């Protein structure tokens, strides 16, 4: 499948659903908004010219400096055309994404994992609950603002003969993270010095 022709036909067919298309390292990437995601994935699965019938994975990425800090990534495979495509959408902490379990039944566990690790809420999910962390776990551990030590210490108490959870005392309640790389600024100044 020719990437340029494929993208042109997709943009012509779905101009409201696709914000941007790009090919990076032989990977096809589409950007869409959360409101159009369900319709776009339905189209990509069932249309004759696409047939992306296999959902390979759903994952999340946290970019705290962005207004829509969470990027949710859907990786699809078309066995008929031997092609892969990546669909990206971005949401903030309170905007839900429509669940795609009704299109791809395998999405159930991946959406649960993304919710458990990042806190991205999937509306209309049949069973949205934690999948990797404990039932009483507080927070979402793959967020960049989640403390490395966590909020509680879980250990086995030999005197009580059971597992106990105790809150960790934080010396620092809130930390500000500067995610800008100091190396980027140095490389820019080196380039200007060479000119």
Curated annotation (Swiss-Prot):
Record's subcellular location: Mitochondrion inner membrane
Keywords: Electron transport, Membrane, Mitochondrion, Mitochondrion inner membrane, NAD, Oxidoreductase, Respiratory chain, Translocase, Transport, Ubiquinone
Gene3D superfamilies with a match to the protein in the record: NADH:ubiquinone oxidoreductase, 30kDa subunit
UniProt entry tagged with the keyword Acetylation: no
Reactions this protein catalyses: a ubiquinone + NADH + 5 H(+)(in) = a ubiquinol + NAD(+) + 4 H(+)(out)
Gene Ontology CC terms, in alphabetical order: mitochondrial inner membrane
One Pfam family in the UniProt entry: Complex1_30kDa
Subunit structure: Complex I is composed of about 45 different subunits. This is a component of the iron-sulfur (IP) fragment of the enzyme.
PANTHER family given in the database record: NADH DEHYDROGENASE [UBIQUINONE] IRON-SULFUR PROTEIN 3, MITOCHONDRIAL (PTHR10884:SF14), NADH DEHYDROGENASE UBIQUINONE IRON-SULFUR PROTEIN 3 (PTHR10884)
Protein name: NADH dehydrogenase [ubiquinone] iron-sulfur protein 3
Organism field: Marchantia polymorpha (Common liverwort)
């Amino acid at each position: 499948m020719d990437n340029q022709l494929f993208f042109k036909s997709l943009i012509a067919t779905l101009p409201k659903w696709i914000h941007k298309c790009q090919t990076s390292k032989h990977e096809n990437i589409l950007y869409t908004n959360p409101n159009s995601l369900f319709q776009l994935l339905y189209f990509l699965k069932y249309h004759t010219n696409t047939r992306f019938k296999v959902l390979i994975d759903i994952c999340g990425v946290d970019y705290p400096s962005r207004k829509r800090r969470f990027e949710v990534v859907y990786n699809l495979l078309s066995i008929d055309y031997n092609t892969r495509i990546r669909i990206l959408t971005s949401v903030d902490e309170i905007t839900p994404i429509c669940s795609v379990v009704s299109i791809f039944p395998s999405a159930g566990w991946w959406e649960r994992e993304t919710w458990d690790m990042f806190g991205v809420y999937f509306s209309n999910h049949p069973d949205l609950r934690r999948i990797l962390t404990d039932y009483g776990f507080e927070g979402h551990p793959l967020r960049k603002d989640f403390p490395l030590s966590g909020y509680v210490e879980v250990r086995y108490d030999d005197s009580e003969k059971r597992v106990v959870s105790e809150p960790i005392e934080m010396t620092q309640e809130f930390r500000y993270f500067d995610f800008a790389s100091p190396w980027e600024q140095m490389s820019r100044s080196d380039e200007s010095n060479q000119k």
